[in-house]
Amino acid sequence: MKKEKEHYVNNKDFFEAMSEYKEGVEKANNTGSARPYVSNYIGDCVMKIATRLSRKGNFRNYPFIEEMIGDGIENALMYIDNYAPYRIDKEGKEVKGNPFAYFTQIIYFAFLRRIAKEKKFLYTKYKIMENTEFHNSKDVLDDTRHQHKIEHNDYSQEYISDFIQNFEQTKRREI
């Protein structure tokens, strides 16, 4: 008999842990006592989700992957109180929530926000480099003592130009 593959996050146990946490938060809010800490198990599940999501093909090769994971974990913990263990569906029936899907979605969008932030930073950096090269080439003509030209090969210059052009086109489409 084939052994069933074990998931890195057991959704049933994760649901139980989140239900306990939410009950503790509700109890603390009603009595005015201190809020419970997020359990190690919940934190471990959130870390596993963020780490495994970062290994997907569309996120894997970014150089700022650690920042993406950190943002994902931070956002998941920031919105942990919005998780509802039970909700009412369209027919009026009570349905169990899915903490794995909830936190995966939060982390996914945190990754997208980090990528957008890093692309904007890279765009700014490349525009500064482009403007600096222009002004420095002008300086070279005026005075040969002030040569501060940044060296690029043809590939990197082409990549930078394409990146700037694509970024600006994307921004124009958003408007």
Predicted regions and their residues:
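Short alpha-helix-to-loop micro-motif enriched in aromatics/charged/Gly
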Residues: 56-65, 76-106, 117-122
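Regular secondary-structure segments
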Residues: 19-22, 73, 77
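Extreme N-terminal regulatory/targeting segments of RNA polymerase sigma factors
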Residues: 1-67, 135-175
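Glycine/charge-rich, flexible interdomain linkers and switch-proximal surface loops
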Residues: 71, 92-93, 127-132
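Short, basic/polar amphipathic helix motif occurring as a linker/hinge flanking DNA-binding modules
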Residues: 117-138
